[in-house]
Amino acid sequence: MPGRLQRSAALAFALAVSIACGESERGPRTVGSDRAGSPVRVATAAGGGSPAARLYVWAGDVDRADSDFLAVLDADPASPGYGSVLTTVPVGRRGTHPHHTEHRLPAGAILFANGFMPGTTFRFDLTDPDEPRLLGSFGEAAGFTWPHSYERLPGGHVLATFQGTGPDNADPGGLVEIDDAGSVVRSASAADPAAPRALLRPYSLAIVPDLDRVVVTSYDMGEDMGMRGGRRGRTHVVQVWRLSDLAVIATIDLPLQPGGGGDEQPGEPRVLADGRTVLVSTFTCGLYRITGLASGYPGAEPVHRFDGGGCAVPVVRGRFWIQSVPNAHAVVALDVSEPAEPVEVSRLELGARSFPHWLAIDEGSHRIVVADRGDGEERIHVVLLDPATGALALDMRFRDPGSDRPGVSFERAEWPHGATGPARPHGSVFGPGPR
């Protein structure tokens, strides 16, 4: 019954929003209503703060003839230019396959961004939001190669996953702590003598300072990209590390979901609002809770299975887990108040041309940026989360100037840095405006 009431409240929110904004029934919609749109105002997050005024989008030139770049968009919901592209920062390299950035803009405003194909991390200085600078880039770190994901430690350094070692990208990879200048602080291998056959390709991570733990997923992105070197294949393990000395505590084989499957290609771990519970989503749409995380014998249990057959990047806000499900063309919200029994409360379908992949949340409001997987339309959207019910609705005001469609298209001929043609957006992060 609680799940039914939550879903009803979410659908009521979406219906009220759609009536206010009048989006066509043929456009994106929240399941259970005929229409979806965005509220007239953007609610600020609990605990104070203001909505972000800038959105940084890491993008790759589609035909690889010109430089990849970081785009800066007007994300101030009170601005008449909301959704406009303000400036761009070319990195002077093409075909890098711009991939993950950090999920939140760090306090020091130095952003790490991944160009996966050459195994490169780019560092951007965003202290002046409207005049960002490329500080430089680096490849290997402490012998580890092909970096993927970045999370900030309590002291401000980055803890990064690296998929492999050496120029051939051989497994296992590892974790590397890096300062804002790109210098190595410490590092450790993902090798585990207790799991000699496990394919250990560190992909993403969740840091749990209260428990002195790091949860690390293993997924071989290089296999999907056609890379050679080391062992390749589909993975099904998650590791628990001790944060204080970067030691592997356990390598966990994910169990099958009820009915089979869902355990392969572990993707993204996230810490819930209590600061101690970690859920892990897989690219095969399983959702798992890490059990016994504070102990020396952690495990994993299946708690949910998304439909669609392919899942991607989640975010957490309060008691809600928001998941991109590209194969269902949808973003889905779960109530995870009871982590062992998540309840779906809302679903926003973005249409057949959308394969939502990357999500990141505005810490000063309840807005979520959505970037496509790369095989759909080159467009980013902003989705609004109702913090009381978990209802999701499309922000209809976030659009190209003069456009009759929500979202900002990256399928354009001109950019501030030149006529370089369409670009493919991926990692995106909200940030403040000029002071």
How should these model regions be labeled?
Residues A46, G92-P106, A141-L153, A195-D212, ...:
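Beta-rich, blade/repeat-based domains predominating
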Residues S50, V57-R64, A160-G173, V216-T235, ...:
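Short, conserved, GDST-rich strand-edge loop motifs in beta-rich repeat architectures
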Residues V72-G81, R123-P132, D180-S183, V240-A247, ...:
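Short loop/turn segments immediately following beta-strands, especially the blade-tip
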Residues L200, L205-V332:
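Beta-propeller domains
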Residues D307-V383:
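Loop/turn-rich, solvent-exposed surfaces of beta-rich toroidal or solenoidal domains
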